[in-house]
Amino acid sequence: MMMKSILITFIIASALLSSVFADIGGKRTLVVLDDLSIKKTHSTFFKNLENKGYKLQFEQSNTKVVLEKYGDFNFDNLILFSPTSESLSFSSADVTRFIDGGNNVLFAGSNVISENIRDIAAECGMEIEEDKTLIFDHFNYDKSQSDHSVLVADQFIDDSPIILQGLNKPILFKGIGHKIRNNPLNYAILTGSSTAFSAKAISGVSTKLMGKSCGLVSSLQARNNARVTFSGSLDLFSDKSFYSKIDNKESGNKEFVERLVSWTFQERGILRASELELVKISTESNSTVAPDVFTIKDEVKYSLKVEEFDGIKGKWVPYVGSLQLEVIMLDPYIRTFIKGDANGLYKIHFKLPDVYGVFTFEASIHKSGYSTLDHIYRKPILPFRHDSYERFIPAAFPYYATCFSMLIGTFIFSIIFLFNKDQLNK
Amino acid sequence: MSTTASTSSNNLTFTSIVKSFFESYSKTPQKLKIIDLFLIYTFITGVIVFTYCCLVGTYPFNSFLAAFISTVGCFVLTVCLRIQINPINNFGKTISIERAFTDYLLCNLILHLVVFNFLG
């Protein structure tokens, strides 16, 4: 009996531990390929991942693979390098569920794209162009080749530096374009320049997509912080592309892909909050209530530690930035922005509102490229107790005097009235 | 009756009105005069309280309300007492002076309980 309970405790503890550690920066990766020769043509890409500790499991697209079993996912990341094959062993619904489970997906397109991949892209807010189209640009193409569809692309996303970490070397790109839905969750990581357009590869008949709305590479960070990246070109990840040159200078392809993939697989830009401290400093109420009971108009100190995940070191480091704090009861009564110090501590002193009720202290960071952080803490704010109001305020002395004068006046009036001998003649 | 009508129609000046008012007021019983005096006192106190509040602000608002309610309440109750014991109103047949005065005191007790509860 004793042994049995110890065994059960051990099993539960190990299950809990494993679930804790599988949380962030998971390395189990499924790679689905159209054809296993991609393993050779993209060897640098895969080798880099393996060097970073990713456990790659290569499967051909028609092999039966189970992503999820009893609500548990067998993989943390999914690389779908099988744009063409119609015999993909899992459906777009499976992939959506995989993303909903907080896992990451990297997938790429090619000249012809299967319905399955199109569905997945559409679920993620990307509408891939028709088959056999390419993005052309008659101004920004690789001048060493006559092919105008080999773009020299440098329209990187610039409002979320966390993703590409300040990359500014142009990259070579040849592939299919996609339209990116206008959605705060979608990031247009690489787009065509204003002279780019999408057209049929053979006939050259252009489609409606043009200019900067031509998405080349884009990402989605879902509300559960799962990250999905789609590239219109599978060749972008190939060895040939990594070592390609623009005007005899090295292209930025290798760095671009490395940074893109490491962001997609949650090696950085993940935030967490801890060590909440909400303390009463001073109070306007006169009564001696317990220190952890808040009354209206109390002066309080709020402090929260925010850390971001550093995938290279594999540990949490302080996040220095800005945090939005709201004190909400249906409406935000207080909304402030707090600057963090070097230790990632966000501290502020403020006065609680003059309204009682159950308030939510919501700290949030919505910074593009970072995971969304919403730290919610609820606490009631009580009204003053009957004995906690201030008494004998000097300004109120005339009022006290009035009340007493009325009392005494009535008393004197009563005496005079009663002892008056005058008879009312009826 | 006819003489008063003729005088009023002849010279309806302010002084004559005041004079006739005091003439007729002197005929009111003394008890009612005492009541009137007390009424004037409560009224003036009420006005003073209100002016003070306008000048100083409403900060201890409950105290102001208590003081103001106290003056207004006293005024209203005393007016009620005056109506009940005034012989012109013929309440004397159903309500005796003693009964009216006891009611008055009881109401005052309740009023001041409320006022002092509210004052703090």
Curated annotation (Swiss-Prot), chain A:
Task: State the source organism's domain of life.
Answer: Eukaryota
Topological domain spans for side Cytoplasmic: 420-426
What are the glycosylated positions?
Answer: N286
Q: Could you list which ranges are Lumenal topological domains?
A: 23-398
Task: Name a Pfam family for this protein.
Answer: OST48_MD
Positions of transmembrane segments: 399-419
Q: Which UniProt keywords apply?
A: Endoplasmic reticulum, Glycoprotein, Membrane, Signal, Transmembrane, Transmembrane helix
The entry assigns this protein to a family as follows: Belongs to the DDOST 48 kDa subunit family.
Q: What is this protein called?
A: Dolichyl-diphosphooligosaccharide--protein glycosyltransferase 48 kDa subunit
Q: Which organism is it from?
A: Dictyostelium discoideum (Social amoeba)
UniProtKB/Swiss-Prot annotation, chain B:
Q: Which residues lie on this side of the membrane: Cytoplasmic?
A: 1-36, 82-99
Q: Which residues form a coiled coil?
A: none
Return the Pfam families for the record: DAD (PF02109)
The membrane topology noted for this protein in its Swiss-Prot or TrEMBL record is: Multi-pass membrane protein
What family does the database annotate?
Belongs to the DAD/OST2 family.
Establish whether keyword Transmembrane is in the entry.
yes
Name where it's found.
Endoplasmic reticulum membrane
An example Gene Ontology biological process: protein N-linked glycosylation
Organism of derivation: Dictyostelium discoideum
Its name, as the record gives it, is Dolichyl-diphosphooligosaccharide--protein glycosyltransferase subunit 2
Keywords attached to this entry: Endoplasmic reticulum, Membrane, Transmembrane, Transmembrane helix
InterPro entries xref list: DAD/Ost2
Can the keyword Transmembrane helix be found in this entry's annotation?
Answer: yes
Q: What does this protein do?
A: Subunit of the oligosaccharyl transferase (OST) complex that catalyzes the initial transfer of a defined glycan (Glc(3)Man(9)GlcNAc(2) in eukaryotes) from the lipid carrier dolichol-pyrophosphate to an asparagine residue within an Asn-X-Ser/Thr consensus motif in nascent polypeptide chains, the first step in protein N-glycosylation. N-glycosylation occurs cotranslationally and the complex associates with the Sec61 complex at the channel-forming translocon complex that mediates protein translocation across the endoplasmic reticulum (ER). All subunits are required for a maximal enzyme activity.
Ranges annotated as spanning the membrane: 37-57, 61-81, 100-120
Give the Lumenal compartment stretches of this protein: 58-60
